[in-house]
Regions:
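Enriched for short, Lys/Arg-rich terminal
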Residues: 1-8, 20, 30-33, 37, ...
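Short structural boundary motif marking the start of a folded domain
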Residues: 8-14
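N-terminal first-folded block
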Residues: 14-41, 46-49
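Generic secondary-structure microfeatures
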Residues: 39, 43, 61, 92-94
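A short, surface-exposed loop/turn module that caps and links secondary-structure elements
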Residues: 43-70
Length: 100
């Protein structure tokens, strides 16, 4: 789905919600290259720059203890690491109103 270099620390997994969200953002004309840049950094275990406002969701009903970052001001990525298996799960992407 998201093409990354073959050599990354974490293998990607996608939820069905993410797959549907991804199709939707492509139809909306979002620059998916921006998403790819962020996912590539996360898949390599790198820290995101401050501009992405990366944080853990502690009070979220659906995404508790997942990571969330801003691709654009109202375009989010929700993700989770499974460290013991070196997997990065892409859970959802979309606007605040679409996800929360």
């Amino acid at each position: 789905m998201i093409d990354l270099p073959t050599k990354v620390k974490y293998h990607l997994r996608y939820t069905s919600d993410f797959k549907n969200n991804y199709k939707k953002i492509k139809k909306q004309g979002k620059d998916v290259e921006k998403l790819k840049i962020v996912v590539s950094k996360l898949a390599n275990g790198l820290e995101l720059e401050e501009k992405y406002k990366n944080h853990i969701l502690t009070d979220s009903k659906h995404y508790k203890n997942c990571g969330e970052c801003h691709i654009e001001p109202d375009w989010l990525l929700v993700y989770q690491y499974i460290n013991d298996e070196l997997i990065l799960v892409l859970i959802a992407t979309g606007s605040h109103s679409e996800l929360f």
